[in-house]
């Protein structure tokens, strides 16, 4: 952290670039390894959004003919997509139709995306944001920062609650199945307990783990130093790779079908 500033900054450009490469490779891996499905599409979009944010952080000092402000807007656009995509993924894993909550999350996402892309002064990225080992961009408007924080944490916690609720429901179904197995003295466990439900539980648990790894460190930083709320995206960038690892390493194998099957 800069002693002369209340902002917490991202890791070095080298770390940003390595993370971008990993997340991009993970998205490509999912495309070529798994059969097309809604879950695969959502996982790929999440990974692409994470990678896009990393490259925006890496380029925020200006590159490829675009200004730092352009890259900052692009970065905010990318990270704003994460909450609705994550909630939608949780619904798909659970086998539930995307309802009012998911649609509302996308509508609020579009509202913030339009704000960050088209409203002047919605994002700050100037010469003072560029350092030898880090870069940062943030929202200078206090009211917008509060609303964006509410949007971000609100939908993330909605997704967490939904995952937990679905795990509880599916677990009850499995427990009832085991009870029926005992009472009937049947040895056909696979006919009573749906293996698909077990995979759903594991996938949802890993998704919760990814959310916690993504949210908890940022939340702790915000609690310790509330002024860092304005730089939430720059703080999250250091932990985004944990979510990417969870998606490609643990959620995808339990929810997607291999192409060579």
What are these regions (language model features)?
Residues 9, 13, 180, 187, ...:
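Interfacial "cap-and-anchor" motif at the non-cytosolic start of specific transmembrane alpha-helices
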Residues 1-2, 24-30, 53-62, 216-222:
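Membrane-embedded alpha-helical segments in integral membrane proteins
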Residues 25-29, 85-92, 152-177, 181, ...:
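Alpha-helical transmembrane segments in multipass membrane proteins, preferentially the mid-helix core
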Residues 29-33, 91-92, 114-118, 218-226:
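Hydrophobic alpha-helical transmembrane segments
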Residues 9-23, 36-132, 140-157, 211, ...:
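Individual alpha-helical transmembrane segments in multi-pass integral membrane proteins
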Residues 30-43, 91-102, 167-177, 191-203, ...:
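Membrane-interface helix-boundary motifs at transmembrane edges
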Residues 1-10:
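Short, strongly hydrophobic alpha-helical membrane anchors
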């Amino acid at each position: 952290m800069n002693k002369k500033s209340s902002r917490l900054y991202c890791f070095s450009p080298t770390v940003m670039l390595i993370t971008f490469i990993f997340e991009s490779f993970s998205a490509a891996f999912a495309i070529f390894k798994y059969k097309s499905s809604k879950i695969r599409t959502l996982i790929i979009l999440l990974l692409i959004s994470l990678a896009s944010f990393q490259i925006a952080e890496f380029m925020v000092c200006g590159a490829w003919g675009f200004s730092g402000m352009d890259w900052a807007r692009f970065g905010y656009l990318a990270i704003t997509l994460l909450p609705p995509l994550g909630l939608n993924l949780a619904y798909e894993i659970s086998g539930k139709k995307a309802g009012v909550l998911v649609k509302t999350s996308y509508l609020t996402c579009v509202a913030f995306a339009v704000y960050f892309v088209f409203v002047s002064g919605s994002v700050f990225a100037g010469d003072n944001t560029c350092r030898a080992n880090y870069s940062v961009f943030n929202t200078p408007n206090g009211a917008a920062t509060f609303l964006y924080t509410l949007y971000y944490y609100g939908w993330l916690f909605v997704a967490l609650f939904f995952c937990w609720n679905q795990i509880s429901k599916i677990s009850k179904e499995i427990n009832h199945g085991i009870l029926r197995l005992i009472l009937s003295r049947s040895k056909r466990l696979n006919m009573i307990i749906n293996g698909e439900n077990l995979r759903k539980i594991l996938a949802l648990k890993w998704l919760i783990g990814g959310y916690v790894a993504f949210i908890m460190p940022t939340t702790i930083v915000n609690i310790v130093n509330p002024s860092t709320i304005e730089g939430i995206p720059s703080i999250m960038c250091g932990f985004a790779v944990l979510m990417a690892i969870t998606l490609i390493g643990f959620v995808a194998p339990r929810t997607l079908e291999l192409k060579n099957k």
